């Protein structure tokens, strides 16, 4: 996790101390560039140019760090684009470490995980839709079944009777019940997931997404071991609720935090409020797996709190992190136990009589 003494901040603090003279806490900008040259401070041409163009008369350690990690100090167009993708979900204090991490990238185009997952999902959908021979692209569950009479599940779909084929607990994320379903998921996961992956790295966002998908099928089977499952909604919900975790983790450093909370609250209210209304008031037989959504939300919030970057970690936040890790581990373990002990086509724990 990033801290107030992250490795990049330590480097910039050391450089600033090398540039100081005597007991200075602020350095005159008029002398800063010449000091960098004479004292052989290893800054890039872009960073030196940004220092020369800075309007301030004096600069302290915080100002120095912001200048050398600013967009103006970055000459690479690709990396400036990456800054723009990451900045909306970061606090100002996160940007120093994240921009520095982006500067250290030696490959492109990032972020590879969300792009790769999306390409595979789109490719599989159109491959199976083409082989289905003329079925409606908007409603065809492409690849879900070997035959159109729905008697033989495809190799990716999660089917309760095939729970022994463990890959199905995750592979169902590659299938979608029509183009509308596919577009809804891939658009959101690209808009939400790419900034998260740029800011928080592939080895943080990848596990959140994949654990959410797996948790979605585990919870679905635990509650309703009669239903087939397709779609990446659990992973998408994990990305959305990882934003919630990010805001909570960096609450004091996060700009526009109340606006972020309001937007997320409205989304949650509309989605889950609609599901509750359909379940208890209209008695509609809803085919959407809200259980997978819930599992994704739990993963994004609790596991996200554990693994996402924290700019300044306070003692209480460290305690909360361990509590979240315990709660999520208990949730995950409980669903696994249910999968082991409950047989396919057992009675639903939450049954809607209209859907029997």
Swiss-Prot record:
Keywords: Hydrolase, Membrane, Protease, Serine protease, Transmembrane, Transmembrane helix. One of its GO terms (molecular function) is serine-type endopeptidase activity. Gene3D superfamilies: Rhomboid-like. The keyword ATP-binding does not apply. It is found in: Membrane. It is an enzyme of class 3 (hydrolase). Signal peptide: none annotated. It is a multi-pass membrane protein. The gene is rom-1. Belongs to the peptidase S54 family. It catalyses: Cleaves type-1 transmembrane domains using a catalytic dyad composed of serine and histidine that are contributed by different transmembrane domains. PANTHER family: PROTEIN RHOMBOID-RELATED, RHOMBOID-RELATED PROTEIN. It comes from the Eukaryota. GO terms for biological process: positive regulation of vulval development; proteolysis. This is Rhomboid-related protein 1. Disruption phenotype: RNAi-mediated knockdown does not affect vulva development. Partially suppresses ectopic vulva formation in a let-60 (n1046) gain-of-function mutant background. Its EC number is 3.4.21.105. One of its GO terms (cellular component) is membrane. The active site is at 233 (nucleophile), 293. Its main location: membrane. The chain crosses the membrane at residues 107-129, 172-194, 201-223, 227-249, 256-275, 290-312, 319-341. Serine protease which activates lin-3 isoform a in the proximal vulva precursor cells (VPC) during vulva development to transmit the inductive anchor cell signal to the distal VPCs.
